[in-house]
């Protein structure tokens, strides 16, 4: 069955977005389609139906394709836990930590896993849409490449090259990328897509004509810059603020070096009654109604950084004045008395003092907990759904059950004064009733209902509309083998 790959001239060129759009576009035409990313490097991950983890972008693409996320959609996931190393996840399961040089030698094994997953998807679906990583023209990464042209050559698939015109230099990006590829790789590029264009397309046409003449390859279309568009970012935290009313609930998130699953905060950013502020290194925590300690890939190191910034003192002051504090996953572990890492899973083996705001201790264990869960929040008995991705096992009387899970377990805890709440569950704010209950707990009255999952579905539909309106659908159908 056909495979079509999308590669980008740079990171954040629009690869994830275009694959998401094409998945829904193909599904509209009655095609059984699956997303695929050979290798992903990201700290945002999702739990799959088969009990593993993949990049969140592939989970969103699965939604666009009408599928449950599966580990075959992202067979190699790298989760950085230091400047030189990462946790390596193969077929949804962590196999250990590797330094960059060690992983380079491991790539043939990783490539075998990639090809196994791709073969299974090809057997099950009529079309596989593949997302590359970064740029295919990184000279230092070409040897042993499994994420871009190395994969395309191995499975003999055509490639669409996408570039972001909003950043400037789009023609240099496209032509320069093409020039740095080998002749066989150049032949795989079947066309270009220009992303995030604003203005009069007539003014761009001379450049498009030149590009086609210079390269001998067609421009498949120009996608517009979309406003009010909110699919999750794959990597960097989006710290842009949106102006809200003076009565908005003030929510502050300290940005720690190894913050993970920052997509947890996207629903807060979109809520019209919430002013979300990310605080970075060297910045003071401003007055707030709610402070949220996020997930972390290196909890002890991030907790040390939190203290270096003086944010622990700011949190204590915030609580003295009646503010609320929420810890999610690694943030929950920080709320306890001790964090023990006897196996050195996140750095040097040892223990660290927690913030001591809830009475429990955490031990980091090699076996990671991966679950999609449902249950009831202790606040208003609101229905909640989410997912667990953590290596820690937490025990102690302070874990009195912030969430009662449908599988019979309890999760997290709430302090006796009701000011501090901790949970292992990511995705807390995606369920409307739990979202509203948490906002009321934090001090917001007359809460407007926001259904983040419905907003995501709306934006996926909008993306598919853009493909139908602005790309050469006949050429796309030919590349996808759709008759």
From Swiss-Prot:
SUPFAM superfamilies: Class I glutamine amidotransferase-like, P-loop containing nucleoside triphosphate hydrolases. Pathway: Cofactor biosynthesis; adenosylcobalamin biosynthesis. Keywords: Cobalamin biosynthesis, Glutamine amidotransferase. One of its GO terms (molecular function) is ABC-type vitamin B12 transporter activity. It comes from Ectopseudomonas mendocina (strain ymp) (Pseudomonas mendocina). PROSITE patterns: GATASE_COBBQ. Residues 248-434 form the GATase cobBQ-type domain. This is Cobyric acid synthase. GO terms for biological process: cobalamin biosynthetic process. The active site is at 329 (nucleophile), 426.
